[in-house]
């Protein structure tokens, strides 16, 4: 069971745009090509202009946006052909590949094969901007190698993006039953080394900056002296600009580093043999991250602010606490200990906290093969624990839903002309309700267990009610400025809920499903639902996809 982040942006975490790329995009705002590009730099700048056009269309027309991204990628490749060591072109092309992957592959509900007039993109060769993770990783490795050949400092954003891609590889491997765990450990090591290098560079650069601050004569920054306010404000703006590494930048890298540990821990399928190699690998690096984050919070946060830097917010501190708690939970293999961990009052009561708690419980259930089928063949004490786990998950998801719903009510008050991510929030609440429906569906099928059998009909009705509510909410528009990807997210959740309801109510003939959902929609979602054993009792395996 997976949940989208409590961040309501269409993408949770994409690649960073480097300063050189930003400068090129800014340049294109003032100039345009009046002649055919000739040099490597010409193609680089033209690619940057096309990429900016793709960004502008992303909210309203995914097909048009993708076509611009393809043009940009083609121009970056031309630039590389003309100059085999043009680092900016290598960086931009690798970053764009991951951006397109994030927007068009990872975003729930978006299917690139449903888009129109994108045949030039879907060529299944190296010229396409739509690539798999292996190709994206190789592109980042090529960019890093060019920087080494040039013997120039590797751009910090390139290092960060490379680490993020490696983490994504680990996360995707969770669904691969044939994954090689030793290979996953190697990827983890590479990702950790990437982020360790980045942290070293960022911390050193920030310490150098602090040294420069301390070298400024005290009177120069005395806001009590006449006419000093304006100069101090200008100096502070300069120091907190993106040209200088800030505490918030370092914390972002720390959070990304923790997510590497989280990703490898979620890949553990045999706790007894795999946990120790993972601990040996991640513990030294986690200690470094812990030390850095403690120093940042103690000296450069809203709890103890520094006047001349971008201080870490309380929200960011909360995010740090939540991900560290999740890592602690994934290190455990005892459900009762896990329940106690997430019950702590020291963890921020955010939607993300409660969704991760539910996910954490599900991870341990999966790791130990605690499924409805296996539990129904076990003694009562195992059923007690399984029931408690499902109940804890339901309680956590209910709290997440309440928090998200309150955020939804607040955002609805915002003037309709603003882009506030309301559509993504609607999709997220719908997903949480669907997850709760799945939990109740499992709770009503624990055979030979009194609480389940006694409340069977109530729990089944709860599941149906949650699905109906999810359908209704997912059908609610996200405002005038809703992005097209948000609409697709909502539509995906609506289909998820409707197909489940059809199965539970026995409306599962081909004609019924075609009429209610449309064939393309239900046949796309059916394989996912068939993997959930708790729908077997309702005849889901009797539904066959008709031949085309």
Feature names for model-found ranges:
Residues 37-57, 83-121, 152-175, 210-214, ...:
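Amphipathic alpha-helical repeat scaffolds of TPR domains
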Residues 186-189, 262-340:
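Non-catalytic interaction/regulatory modules that flank or connect domains
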Residues 31-37, 77-90, 139-157, 198-216, ...:
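Flexible helix-coil transition and linker loops at the boundaries of alpha-helical arrays
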Residues 37-41, 62, 130-133, 155-156, ...:
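Amphipathic, non-membrane alpha-helical segments in soluble helical-bundle scaffolds
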Residues 1-15, 309-312, 316-548:
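Long C-terminal extensions of eukaryotic subunits of large macromolecular complexes
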Residues 4-16, 23-26, 69-154:
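Long amphipathic alpha-helical scaffold regions
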Residues 53-71, 99-142, 168-197, 201, ...:
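Short coil/linker segments at helix-helix boundaries
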Residues 6-70:
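N-terminal alpha-helical scaffolding segments that mark the starts
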């Amino acid at each position: 069971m997976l949940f989208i982040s409590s961040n309501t942006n269409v993408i949770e975490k994409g690649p960073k745009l480097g300063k050189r790329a930003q400068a090129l995009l800014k340049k294109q705002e003032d100039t345009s090509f009046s002649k055919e590009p000739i040099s490597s730099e010409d193609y680089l700048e033209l690619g940057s202009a096309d990429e900016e056009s793709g960004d502008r269309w992303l909210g309203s027309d995914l097909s048009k946006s993708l076509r611009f991204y393809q043009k940009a990628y083609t121009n970056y490749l031309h630039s590389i052909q003309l100059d085999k060591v043009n680092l900016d072109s290598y960086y931009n092309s690798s970053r764009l590949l991951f951006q397109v992957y994030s927007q068009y592959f990872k975003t729930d509900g978006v299917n690139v094969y449903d888009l129109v007039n994108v045949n030039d993109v879907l060529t299944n060769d190296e010229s396409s901007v739509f690539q798999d993770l292996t190709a994206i990783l190789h592109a980042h490795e090529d960019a890093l190698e060019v920087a080494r050949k040039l013997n120039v400092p590797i751009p910090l954003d390139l290092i960060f993006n490379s680490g993020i891609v490696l983490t994504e590889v680990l996360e995707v491997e969770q669904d691969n039953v044939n994954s090689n765990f030793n290979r996953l450990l190697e990827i983890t090591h590479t990702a950790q080394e990437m982020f360790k290098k980045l942290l070293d560079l960022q911390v050193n650069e920030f310490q150098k900056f602090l040294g420069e601050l301390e070298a400024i004569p005290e009177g120069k920054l005395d806001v009590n002296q006449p006419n000093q306010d304006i100069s101090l404000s200008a100096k502070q703006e300069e120091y907190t600009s993106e040209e200088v590494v800030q505490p918030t930048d370092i914390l972002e890298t720390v959070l990304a580093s923790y997510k590497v540990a989280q990703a490898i821990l979620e890949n553990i399928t045999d706790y007894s043999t795999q946990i120790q190699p993972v601990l040996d690998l991640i513990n030294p690096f986690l200690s470094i991250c812990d030390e850095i984050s403690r120093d940042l919070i103690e000296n450069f946060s809203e709890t103890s602010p520094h006047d001349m830097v971008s201080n870490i917010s309380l929200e960011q501190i909360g995010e740090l606490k939540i991900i560290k708690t999740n890592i602690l939970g994934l290190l455990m293999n005892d459900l009762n200990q896990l329940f106690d961990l997430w019950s702590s009052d020291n963890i921020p009561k955010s939607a993300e906290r409660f969704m991760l708690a539910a996910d954490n419980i599900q991870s341990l259930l999966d790791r130990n093969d605690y499924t409805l089928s296996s539990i129904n063949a076990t003694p009562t004490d195992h059923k007690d624990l399984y029931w408690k786990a499902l109940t804890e998950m339901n309680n956590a998801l209910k709290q997440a839903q309440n928090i998200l719903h309150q955020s939804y009510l607040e955002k609805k008050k915002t003037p309709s002309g603003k882009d506030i991510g309301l559509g993504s929030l609607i999709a997220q609440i719908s997903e949480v309700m669907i997850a709760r429906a799945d939990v109740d569906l499992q709770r009503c099928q624990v055979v030979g267990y009194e609480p389940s059998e006694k409340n069977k009909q109530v729990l089944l009705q709860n599941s149906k009610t949650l699905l109906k509510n999810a359908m209704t909410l997912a059908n609610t528009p996200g405002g005038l400025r809703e992005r097209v990807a948000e609409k697709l997210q909502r539509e995906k959740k609506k289909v998820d809920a409707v197909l489940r309801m059809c199965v539970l109510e026995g409306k599962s003939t081909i004609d019924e499903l075609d009429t209610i959902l449309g064939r393309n929609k239900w046949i796309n979602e059916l394989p996912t639902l068939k993997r959930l054993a708790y729908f077997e009792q309702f005849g889901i395996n009797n539904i066959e996809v008709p031949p085309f």
